[in-house]
Curated annotation (Swiss-Prot):
GO molecular function, one term: structural constituent of ribosome
Keyword presence, RNA-binding: yes
Alphabetical keyword list: Ribonucleoprotein, Ribosomal protein, RNA-binding, rRNA-binding
Protein name, entry field: Large ribosomal subunit protein eL20
Pfam families: Ribosomal_L18A
Gene that this sequence comes from: rpl18a
Length: 76
């Protein structure tokens, strides 16, 4: 069964650290991590070593902050 995972972290190694929060609907936490590394790495041109994960947590549908993820789940 799918679960909703929230990842909080920061990108280091740039002029100033950038903080981010990402939410994914995945089967395993590892899938969410891989997707996050891929998205952040390609969008900001940083290596995985420069992406620091601060927190990974499973959240309920009511806690979702991402409007895109909310809309996607409502459609299903």
């Amino acid at each position: 069964m799918a679960k909703i995972v929230r990842i909080k972290g920061e990108i280091v190694g740039k002029d100033e650290p950038m903080v981010f929060t990402k939410e994914y609907n995945v089967l395993k936490e590892n899938d969410a991590l891989e997707t996050m590394y891929s998205e952040i790495g390609s969008k900001h041109a940083v290596k995985r070593a420069n992406i620091k994960v601060v927190e990974i947590s499973e959240i309920s549908v009511e806690e979702i902050q991402s409007p895109i993820l909310k809309k996607t789940l409502e459609m299903n």
